[in-house]
Amino acid sequence: MSKKDSKNSPKKSKDTNSDESSSSNAETSSDKSITYLKLRDDSKTEIKYIYHMSDIHIRKLQRHDEYKEVFDRTYKILKSEITSNDSIIVLTGDIMHMKTEMSPEIIDITSNFFKTLNEIAPVILIPGNHDCNLSNKNRLDALSPIIENTYKFPDLFYLKKSGLYQFYNIVFGVTSVFEDDLVTADKITKEHWNKIKQPNKFKIALYHGPVHNAKTDVGYRMNNEQLLAEDFKGYHYVMLGDIHRFQYMNENKTIAYSGSLIQQSYGESLHGHGILKWSLVEKSSELIEVRNDYGYCTVKIIDGQMIETKIPKKPRVRFILENTNQIQYQEVINNLEKQYLIQEIVKESNLKTKYNNSSPSKKDKPTAYATQETMVNSYMEKRGLDEKTTKGIIELHKKIYQKILANNKEKVVDVMHNSTKTQKWRLLELRFSNALSYGKDNVIDFRNYDPNKIIGIFAPNHYGKSAVLDIILFCLFDKCSRGDRRDILNKNEKNMSCSILLSIGSQQYYIERIGVRNKNGLTVKIDVNFYSITTNEKGKETMTKLNGLDKNETNRKIAELIGDYNDYLTTCFSLQTKNSNFIDMTQLQKKEYLNDILKLNVFEECHNYAKDKLKDLTGQLKVLEQKIGQKSLDDFKSSVRKITEEMSVINSEIKWIGNNLLPQVDIVINKNPVVPRIYYNELLDYDLTDVKSIIRTQTNILKQLSDKQNNNEIGTISVEITSKKQQLNEISTKFDEEKIKLETQLGELRTNKENLLKKLIKIPKINSDEIETHKKTVQECEDRINIIDKVFEEHENDELTDKMSRIDELKALISRLRKSLAVTNNNDYSHLDKLYEELINVDTKYRQCISNVLNPKKILNQQEKNHLSEIVKIKRYFTDNLIDNNGLLGDYDKGKSNLNDELIEKIMSKNNQIIDQENEWFEQADEYLKQDNSGIIDVDDIIKQRSKIQEQIRKILLNILNKKENQIIESKINKAQTELDALAEFTGTKKEIDNLVQEKKLLKDKIVFLKEKISQNELAVQNQKSNDEIKKQINEIESKIDQITCIIKDNTSEINTLKQYISEKESIIKKHQKQIDQTNKLNHHYKLLDKYYLEYTNWNHKNSTREKWLKTRTEMNDKLNDLNKNLDKKQVELDMFKKEVEQYIESRKEFDDKSTEVNLYQHYVQIMNCNGLPYEMLKTYLPLIESDVNEILHSMVNFNIEFMFYDDSKLEEQKTKQLKSNMGSVDINICYHNMKPYNVQLASGFERFIIGLAIRMTLCQISLTSKPNFLIIDEGWSCLDSDNLSNVGTIMNYIKTQYEHVIIISHLDELKSQADYIISIDKVKGYSRIIENKKTIKKIINKKPNKIIEL
C-alpha cells in the first residue's frame, strides 16, 4: 500500500541484541540521516537460511483455536528444519488483525507466538499497516507493548524504523510503514559493506506494502507505479509482506511475497499458505505449506450434484448453485455435515439459477441487455393471448414506440434495438471561490492524481470537508444536498464562482456558475455558462458556448450530457446526511430508479401514451354505444313487426266501430225522445231533485208525524213534575238543618288551624350539607392545629428535616385525587320521595291496565299475546335496573353520614317493595300467557311516564353516590393541602413561628365560632321536627274542612239539578198545542209526495236512457278519433325505425371497429404497466445485479443477498423458505448460513452500509446513463466495528479497481491510513482553503544517498 508523507522525526525504539553486540538507543537528528545499526556480528557466523512469514492477522477473539493448531504445526516444521545457528526467521508485518483494539487473549497468543519462535531461532520483525495507526504516528503501535513488557526476547529484533540493520553476514534495508523514504540498496556504503568479514554476505530488503503489478488474493493487479520491483535494484533478495498471495515479482525469483500464513477469506486459495524458505547461498527458495484443518473453500453444485472439491476437516464453505433447487441444496449440506465439522456456510446463486436453465448443457447464457423486441414477443405468448391479438399488440407497440422515440429523442433511449447513449465522463479540475465556508481561489486538479487511487479529504470538524461534495453537485446540477441554492454563497461575501472541467472521450466540457448577492442581501442571482472545448492541430483551444435560451434549458442540456442529480446520489455520491441508499427506497422508487438507470423508461412513456389514447378511444366508444343503444338489429326488426301488427289491429277496430256500432246507437237514441218534467207548488219548499231526495223528504215527514203523535206523554210529564217538586222540598228542608251544623263545625276547624299556625316556629333555612361542611371545617382546623403543634415540637427539638420531598409527595397526591373527582350537580333531592310516590301511583295504574288486559273470560289472539309479551320484557328491563341500583347502593360504605344512611335504606326499601310487586305480576302474567288468556290495552303512555320517573331516580342516586365519594376525596385533598400549606409556609425562622402561633389562635377562634353555628343548626333541626308535627295536625284539619265543604257542595248540586229538570218539563207542556197544527199539514204533503214520486220515476227513466246512449255515442266518437291518431303515430314510428335501422347498421360497424381498437389498447396498457413487461424485463437484470453485488460482498463479509421477485418456477423454493413473494415488488433478503433469510430492512447498520455500497457500485457499473469516473464516500464507515474495519484495506483495493478516483471523507484512523493522496483543508482568517498533498515513495527513489549514522 502507498504511504503518506511524514514530517515527524523518528522516535526512540528499543532493539534487543545478542551477546555479540550491545544494546543501543538511537535517534536520528535529520530527515536525510539513515540509521545503520549492528544487531549482532562475530565476523564468523553466517546466516544461510531465512524462514519468511507474513500477514498472520491474529484476531481479537475469533479463530484462536484454528490459529493455535496452525502455530503448533508451524513450530514443528521450523524445529525440524532449523538444526543449527545458520537460520533466522523473518516476519514482514501484519501480525495483528486490528491495530487499535486489543484483548487479553490476543496478547497471550501473540506473546506465546513470539516466545516460541524466539526459542527456535532469532527473529527479525518489522511492523505492518495492521500493526499500527498510520494516521496518527504519535500513537503507540500494537507490537511494542507485547515485545517490551510481556517477556524478555533475547533473539527477537523489532525493526520499527527505516534504516540499515546488520545481522551477522546480512544487511537488512528496512523501509518502515511509519516513514515514506524507500531505503534503496545504494544507501549501503562500501565502508560498511567491506567491514563484514564473512565470505558470504547479502543485502536483503524488508518492506510491507504493495508493489506495482502485484496480484491480490481476489485476482486484482496492484496499480502502484510509484513503487516498482526494479526500485529494489542492488538487493540480493527482497522479502515483502501485505499481499496475501504467494508470488514472485521478478523472473529471478529474488523478490517475493510469502503470502498469508493462514487463509483469511474465500478470496484466497485454500492452498499456498505457509513459510517461504530462502536458501541464500544456493539462491533458491521454496514454499513450505502448513496444513490447516479449517480453511475457506468454494463448492459448486450444478444440476443438484456437487462438483468434487477438496475440503478440509473443519471448513467454511461457500456454495455456488447452478440449476439447483432448495431441496437438492439441503441434501448436499446434510451429506457434508455428516463428513465435516462445517464452521460456516455461504450460499450464492449464479446467473443460470436465476434464469432457471434446465441443465448446464445450455451454453447460451442470457445476456443482461438482450434485444427487448424479442422479450415483447415472448411476454405476449406467456400471457396466453391469441395470435391475432399478439400480432396486433406488437404492431401497435412499434407504432407507439416510434412515435415516442421521434418526439423524445433526448429523453428516451432506443432500448428496443440496444442503441444506448451510455458514456463515461472524467472529472479533470474543480475551481471555486467564496463557496460555502471557502474563500477565494481554491483548486483541485484531479489530473495530478494517478488513476485507481484513494484520495482522502481530511480536516477537523467545521472546516468544510463535506462542502467540497456539495460544491461539485452544485456546479454540475445547480443544487446541493444541504440548504437552499442561495446558501452556496459565503455569508460574508457578495459574489462567488465555481467551475468544473470534464471530458467525455477526447471532448472536453466546461461548466461555470457565477453567483451575485442582490442589494437586499436576501437572494442570490446565479448564472450558468456551458462550453465545449476543442483543440486544433496547433494545440490552440477554442471554447464554444452551449447555453440554451434560458438557465433552465442550459441545465437540461448539462443533465442530458452527464445524467440526473438523484441518480448520482444513489450511485457515486454517498453523502453523510442524505445517503440515498437503494435499500431505503420504497418499492415504487426502486422500480422507477432501476427503470431510469437501465433506460426502461421508454416503456413508461409508451404506457402513458397508450393510457391517454385509451381514454380518448373509450370516450369515442361510449358515444357510439349511446348511438346504437342497447338494441340489436333483431330488436329493430321485432319492433317494426310489432308496430305493423298493432296498426292492423287499430284499422280493424276503426272499421268495426264506424260501420257497426255507431249506426245501432243512433237508432236507439231516435226511439227515446225528450219528455217534459211536472212540478207541484205545495212541494216547492222541499228538495226533490232526484229519487233519493224524494225518499229522504218522505222519511223526514214521517218522523215528524211520529213525534207529533206522542200527546199521551204530556200527562205523564205532569205527574213527574209534581213528584220532583215534592222531592225538592224534602231535600231542601233536610239540607237547611244540616248546613247550620256543618258551617258551625267548619268554623271551629278553621279556628283550630289558625291557632296551630301561630304555634309554628320561624327558623332559618337549614342545609344539612352546611352542617357537615362546618363539622369538616372544624376537623380540618383541628388537623391544622395538630400539624402546627408538630412543627413546634420538631422545631423545639431541633430535628426539622428537609420538607421538600414531603411537599412533592403531597402535590402528587392532590393531583391524583383531583383527577379522580366525579362530575355532579347541586340539585335539591328533597323531591326524591315524591318521585317514588309517583312511581308507585304509575305502577298502580299500570297494574290496573294490565288487570283489564288479563281478563280470564277472554281468549288471547296472537296479536294480543305478542303485545303482552312485549309488556313483560319492558317491565323486566326496569325491574332489572332497580335490582342493579340496589346493588350499587349496597356497595356504599355506611357509617359516614347518618342522613345518607337513612336515605339509602329508605330508597332500597322502596325499591325492594316495587321489585316484590313486579315479581307477583310476572307470575300472574306467565300464568295468563300459558292459558292463552289475554286482553287488549294501550299502556304506551304509562310505560313512557314510568321510564322517565325511573331514569330521574337513577340519576339522583348516581349523583348522591358521586357526591359522597367526592366528599371523601375532597376531605383527603383538604387534609393534604393543609399539610402542604404548613410545609410550604414554614421556613424555620422566628417570624414564621410567630405567624404559626397567630394562625393557631385564629383557628381556635374559628372552631369556637363554627361549633356555635353547629349548635344553632342542631337546635333548628329540633324546631323543624316540632313544626313538622304541627303541620301534620294542620293537614288533618284541612282534610276535614275539605270533607265538609264537599258535602255542602254535593247537596247544593243535587237541589239545582232537580230545579232544572222541573223547568224543562214545564216548557214541553207549553209547546204541545203547536204540534197539532203542524201534524195536519205534514199529512197533506206526504200524500202529495206519493203521487209526485210515481211521475218523477217515469220521467227519469226515459230521460236517463236517452242520456246513456248519447254518452255512448260520444265515447265511441272519441275512441274513433283516438284510434285514428294512434294509427298516424304508429306510422310515424314505423318510418323512424326504418331510418334508425339504416343508422344502426352504420354505427354498429364503426362501434365494432372501435371496440377492437379499445380492446387492443387495454391489453397494451396492462402489458406496459410497471408490473407488466417493464417488470419482467427488470427481472432479467436483477440476477446480474445480485451476482455482481455478491461478488463484491464476498470480499468483505460472510453473507450474501438475494433479490426476491415473482416467478412461477420459484414458488416451491419460496414455500420452503416460508417467504411471500409480491409480483409488484423488488425485495432484498440477507442470507447467512443456518439462518432463514431476512429482509434487508431488518439489517444492522454495518450490513446496510456494506450492502448499500455494493449495490451502489453495481448500479453505477450497469447503469445505461452517463456515469463519472469517481466514487465519493462521506463519513459512511462509522458503523463498522473493529473486526470489520480490519477488512477496509481489502475493500479499498477492490473499489480502486472500479473507479479512477475514490474520494473518502472520514475521521476514522483506519480510513485515513488507506489514502494514497491527501487533500488537506486549512482555515485562514475564518475562510477554508484547499491544500493539496501529493508525495509518494516514487519521488524519494531518485534522491541522492542520505547520510548514514552508524551505531
From Swiss-Prot:
Residues 1-17 have a biased composition (Basic and acidic residues). One of its GO terms (biological process) is double-strand break repair. Residues 19-31 have a biased composition (Low complexity). InterPro entries: Calcineurin-like_PHP_ApaH, Metallo-depent_PP-like, P-loop_NTPase, Rad50/SbcC_AAA. Transmembrane segments: none annotated. Residues 1-31 are annotated as: Disordered. One of its GO terms (molecular function) is ATP hydrolysis activity. PANTHER family: ABC TRANSPORTER ABCH.3. This is Uncharacterized protein R555. It comes from Acanthamoeba polyphaga mimivirus.
